[in-house]
Amino acid sequence: MAAITAGMVAELRGKTDAPMMECKKALTEADGDMAKAEEILRVKLGNKASKAAVRIAAEGIVAVSISADGKLGSIIEVNSETDFVAKNDEFIALSNGCAALVANQNPADVAALSALPMGEGTVESTRSALVGKIGENMTIRRFVRFEAKGKLVSYIHGGAKVGVVVDLVGGDEQLGKDLAMHIAASKPKSLDSTGVPAELLETERRVAIEKAREAGKPEAMLEKIAEGTVQKYLKDVTLLGQVFVKAADGKQTIEQLLKEKGASVAGFTLYMVGEGIEKKVDDFAAEVAAQAAAAAAKK
């Protein structure tokens, strides 16, 4: 059997855009024959993986995995091109499986996660096979693993488009759920003011000064006005400063709620699917027609 070198794998990948592991398998099956390996990939993937890999994946789901004792957990975002595929059972199973691997195996990054065993292959080969089967690109975008100081509580909202994990010290399960729901609704940027970048605060300060100046406020008052604006901004974007969404009086902040319950938040992570990804907007009718055509082609 011919030796399969990294250069051969790279060459085949360059010709087909197929995943590295699939290229290596094809070359092995073809005993090193490049043309035959290319044909094997064409038959196996129908060129779907290659074509799909260049398209933007801005839909998808957020998945979480938390241990029974609430001490270990993870949150992960896996993207697809359309919401239709994001609801596919195999896509959901892939996402949940990846979340469990992150929690249990602690991979350093997406590349390390992709190399972990899954089923009869790896995460990457499983993902690639699903891309070939469905004909739509899907990518593991990001994840966070948690080792709780307290107990982890999660919340998934809107068809898994928003996910939250909270590390709650003290309190009970209901408090954790309430906090996670609040975070999903109010979208704080950080736990407290120490987590807000200084440059962001400086931008808010400059904008406030310019607005006050344009409004004709005295120069001597500009700094005081800016400081008030910054403090209001901090209340709006920090979890502890925000008004609790379920506050009976409409005034109780999260910080006050936690003090009342004798609890604290060690940290949290909020994921929103596609956040920061430039999404291509297609005509809805055209998208439905494309999905129907793809389904018909598989019959």
Curated annotation (Swiss-Prot):
Keywords of the record: Cytoplasm, Elongation factor, Protein biosynthesis
CDD domains: UBA_EF-Ts
Keyword Zinc part of the UniProt annotation: no
Any Pfam family the entry gives: EF_TS
Region called Involved in Mg(2+) ion dislocation from EF-Tu, residue ranges: 82-85
Top-rank lineage group of the source organism: Bacteria
Stretches that traverse the bilayer: none
Protein biosynthesis among keywords: yes
Subcellular location: Cytoplasm
InterPro entries: EF-Ts_dimer_sf, Transl_elong_EFTs/EF1B, Transl_elong_EFTs/EF1B_dimer, Transl_elong_Ts_CS, UBA-like_sf
PROSITE patterns per record: EF_TS_2 (PS01127)
UniProt-recorded Gene Ontology molecular function terms: translation elongation factor activity
Cellular component aspect of the GO annotation: cytoplasm
PANTHER family: ELONGATION FACTOR TS, ELONGATION FACTOR TS, MITOCHONDRIAL
UniProt family annotation: Belongs to the EF-Ts family.
Primary role: Associates with the EF-Tu.GDP complex and induces the exchange of GDP to GTP. It remains bound to the aminoacyl-tRNA.EF-Tu.GTP complex up to the GTP hydrolysis stage on the ribosome.
Name the UniProt record assigns to this protein: Elongation factor Ts
Organism this protein belongs to: Dechloromonas aromatica (strain RCB)
The gene coding this protein: tsf
